[in-house]
């Protein structure tokens, strides 16, 4: 989601769209996601700080891809995302904040993807709630 939202934001910037309008348009569309509603805000603020780094994204997507390969399933998108983040790590360092993957596109397009009025960090101010067990009826694992 982070890579696709980076492409969407950068494309709209290149097309001359207002980034605040772009954010709201994506939020109201079928392209909306948790990643858009959270990480797009810190991208548009410029801080890009979600306390998650490129090497952690690479690790997670690598594990996912490896699990699929173990079952003989050759994925299409995961290997591309792996390559994109490997390139990001090479350019900016493995401990670079993951939303800065957008810099690859910003540099290519010679733009800065920024909006106004977005927070520099995402703060979870919802009250803590007691967790609960999710029970799946008729579960059939392979």
Name each model feature, range by range.
Residues 1-108:
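Helical "substrate-binding/catalytic lid" subdomain
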Residues 90-142:
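NAD(P)-dependent dehydrogenase/reductase Rossmann-like domain
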């Amino acid at each position: 989601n982070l890579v696709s939202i980076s492409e969407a934001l950068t494309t709209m910037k290149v097309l001359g769209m207002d980034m605040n309008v772009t954010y709201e348009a994506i939020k109201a569309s079928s392209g909306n996601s948790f990643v858009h509603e959270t990480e797009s805000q810190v991208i548009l603020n410029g801080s890009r700080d979600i306390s998650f780094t490129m090497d952690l994204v690479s690790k997670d997507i690598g594990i996912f891809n490896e699990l699929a390969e173990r079952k003989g399933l050759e994925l299409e998108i995961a290997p591309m995302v792996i390559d994109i983040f490997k390139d990001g790590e090479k350019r900016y360092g493995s401990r670079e904040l993951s939303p800065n993957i957008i810099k690859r596109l910003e540099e290519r397009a010679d733009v800065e993807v920024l909006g106004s009025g977005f927070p520099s960090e995402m703060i979870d101010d919802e009250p803590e709630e007691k967790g609960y067990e999710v029970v799946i009826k008729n579960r059939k694992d392979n």
